[in-house]
Design a protein with these regions (language model features):
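ACP-dependent fatty acid/polyketide chain-elongation machinery
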Residues: 1-66, 88, 244-256, 346-360, ...
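Condensing-enzyme catalytic core mediating Claisen C-C bond formation in acyl metabolism
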Residues: 3-7, 31-35, 213-288, 297
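Conserved beta-ketoacyl condensing-enzyme motif
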Residues: 6, 27-162, 191-199, 294-308, ...
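Acyl-CoA/ACP chain-elongation machinery
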Residues: 35, 182-227, 260-274, 302-309, ...
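Glycine-/small-residue-rich "gating" segment that lines the acyl/pantetheine channel
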Residues: 124-131, 172, 176, 193-248, ...
């Protein structure tokens, strides 16, 4: 089996596109959530909160020929990937285009504006709203295909459209592709664009925050006063590489990916199950050859939903007790759906290198219905971590767990 390392990583978030910018916002202890008064036009939509990326602009050097089939979700994915490849020292490298580099990337759905166009067609009985690229922008694998085409990646394409585990499964399946010798390099991650149609999905489940007048107080993962999640948007990309290839080309190695597991609850499409969440984490530990005590930090899924936080906390505590530091980055960016697993893995690795781990903001009184955990609160925590775990869970009962090892 091949060893797999991270040689590049980047993202596009509501806090910026680089670690110094994101770190400054994390350390300020404020979230990216804002009121969305424009959503008032949707009768029956209760939440008016989101965490949009307000300043995203497609780079001027992107040619129209390569972007005309991109919706916003593909644009976010492509920019995050360009930044990650640059950090890996792979911009215009021949390995990208000789078949040895693939892509495993996902989003919950494609872009949402094309869906509206098809709705107009069905309602008006006219195809006037449809163009040659409408479907390509909305297809479930649009982010993987567009990012792959943009950089000329000729290896395997693994689209991961699995809701909130799209990004983490992308990383995990990329890891497996390299580990088993199918590819030398993999671009991996996830993206999501903001749309009120995503908010209403959770609204109908009574799972969205109603703190419309106090966006700075939501979401509140694991807190007694939490009242639901907030939708966000963004993209995250990791460049995974076979260790010997990375060393041969003199790449800067950020971390090693040593464990990945994914499984399914097979119980209920929207109600998470503690037992299989726990099993997923145990499987990742077993693959990495680690004990629970070896993990120095856990990046929680932490959505701030009632059932999700309870199930996750009990699954985590059953393995780690209350001794392993844990926090949820969704308290800052909201739930970025298909992007969250990749964004959270990227930022967890940045924090491991920094030695400072962000707290779960708005967590002031842990819910007694949740299992006791070592929540990172307040101003964050300085930690020397050799291994970290990043967990994500999704509709359909899909669970993922990734384990990264500090390099050097």
């Amino acid at each position: 089996m091949k060893r797999v390392v991270v040689t590049g990583m980047a993202g596009v978030t509501a806090f910026g596109q680089d670690w110094p910018s994101v770190r400054a916002k994390l350390q300020a202890g404020r979230n990216a959530v804002v009121a969305m008064p424009e959503w008032a036009i949707y009768e029956g939509l209760n939440t008016r909160l989101a965490a949009p990326i307000a300043d995203f602009v497609l780079p001027a050097h992107y040619p129209r020929k390569k972007t005309r089939a991109m919706g916003r979700v593909s644009q976010l994915a492509t920019v995050a990937t360009e930044l990650a490849l640059a950090r890996a020292g792979l911009t215009d490298h021949p390995v990208l285009t000789d078949g040895r580099t693939g892509i495993a990337y996902g989003s919950s759905i494609g872009s949402t504006e094309p869906i509206r166009a098809f709705g107009v067609m069905l309602n008006d009985k006219s195809t006037a709203s449809i163009t040659a690229t409408t479907y390509v922008q909305m297809m479930p694998h649009t982010a993987a295909v567009n990012a792959g085409l943009f950089f000329g990646l000729r290896g395997r394409v693994i689209p991961t459209s699995s809701a909130c585990t799209s990004g983490s499964q992308g990383i995990g399946y990329a890891f497996e592709a390299i580990k088993h010798g199918y590819q030398i390099l993999m671009v991996a991650g996830g993206a999501e664009e903001l749309c009120p149609s995503e908010a209403v999905v959770f609204d109908t489940l009574f799972a969205t925050s109603q703190m419309n007048d106090n966006p700075e107080l939501a979401p509140r993962p694991f807190d007694r006063q939490r009242d639901g999640l907030v939708i966000g948007e963004g993209a995250g990309t990791l460049v995974l590489e076979e260790l010997e290839h990375a060393q041969a080309r003199g790449a800067t190695i950020i971390a090693e990916l040593v464990g990945f597991a994914t499984n399914c609850d097979a119980a209920h499409v929207t109600q998470p199950q503690q037992e299989t969440m726990q099993l997923c984490m145990e499987m990742a530990l077993a693959q990495a050859g680690l004990k629970a005590a070896d993990i120095g930090y856990i990046s929680a899924h932490g959505t701030a939903t009632e059932r999700g936080d309870i199930a996750e906390s009990h699954a985590t505590a059953a393995i780690f007790g209350d001794k392993t530091p844990i926090s949820s980055l969704k308290s800052y960016f909201g739930h970025t759906l298909g992007a969250c697993g990749a964004i959270e893995a990227w930022l967890a690795l940045e924090m491991m290198q920094e030695g400072w781990f962000a707290p779960t903001i708005n967590l002031t009184e842990p819910d007694p219905a949740c299992a006791p955990l070592d929540h990172v609160m307040g101003n964050g925590r300085m930690l020397a971590v050799d291994y970290l775990m990043s967990n994500n869970f999704a509709f359909g009962g899909i669970n993922t767990s990734l384990i990264f090892k500090r390099w050097g």
